[in-house]
Regions:
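Recognizes the extracellular SEMA beta-propeller fold with strongest preference
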Residues: 1-211
Length: 211
């Protein structure tokens, strides 16, 4: 590890960096940041590179940490001494994915933005793929699951936002009541000048969401 850039490995071969194949930094719009708080778990099978970790308290009042790798997902007990393989039946396959995690009504939901969005309704089983549009970004807002940069019907909509009904993260039915809906940041019938508008993430402030 470089003494000039604490936390960012610059002078070790990528093969020696177990939890990040030469990429232990993450890129977000306008910044580059190091993955703070991520340490090597010796119990990860085959020293699989870790891309993200999410700790939460389940409905059974127990703390768990979901450990996301390129092609595997594990659940660790609070003390990190035991783990369970919760990889979905169709495993994720994208290398260097940016994983995201949200809790909607106590339901853990995660995605790598490429292969699908998964839920974990039963802590005794593997992750289950959700029948909702694929999205590169997601956020919990007022108990609704918000999706950004959406893919629907094999078409990609970089400027589209979808939101579910409250406490129903799998119900995206568009209704006049506005409880489930969709918004596009570019006009589908426009002149094309807005085509560069792309959703890059969400932010919450009180009861508002910033895109």
């Amino acid at each position: 590890q470089s003494t000039n850039n604490a936390g960012i490995v610059t002078n070790i071969p990528s093969t020696d960096v177990v939890w990040a194949t030469g990429k232990n930094v993450r890129f977000k719009p306008g910044c580059v940041y190091k993955t703070l708080g991520k340490t090597l778990l010796a119990t990860v099978p085959n020293s699989t590179p870790i891309r993200a970790m999410f700790t939460f308290r389940g409905y059974d009042n127990a703390f768990r940490t979901i450990v996301c790798c390129d092609k595997k997902v594990y659940s660790y007990a609070e003390e990190y001494t035991t783990y369970t393989d919760i990889t979905p039946s169709t495993a994720p396959s994208y290398v260097n994915a940016i994983w995201q995690f949200e809790l909607i009504g106590g339901l853990p939901i995660l995605t790598n933005g490429v292969n699908g969005i998964w839920k974990w309704p039963s802590f005794g089983s593997v992750l289950q793929k959700m029948s909702i549009p694929l999205a590169k970004y997601m956020k919990n807002s007022m108990h609704r699951l918000m999706l950004g940069h959406v893919t629907e019907g094999s078409y990609e909509y970089p400027s589209r936002v979808r939101w579910s009904k409250s406490a129903q993260p799998e119900v995206f039915t568009i209704g006049k009541d506005g409880k489930g809906g969709r918004a596009d940041f570019i006009k589908m019938t426009g002149d094309g000048m807005e085509s560069q508008e792309r959703i890059k993430g969400f932010g919450n402030f009180k009861n508002r969401v910033f895109v």
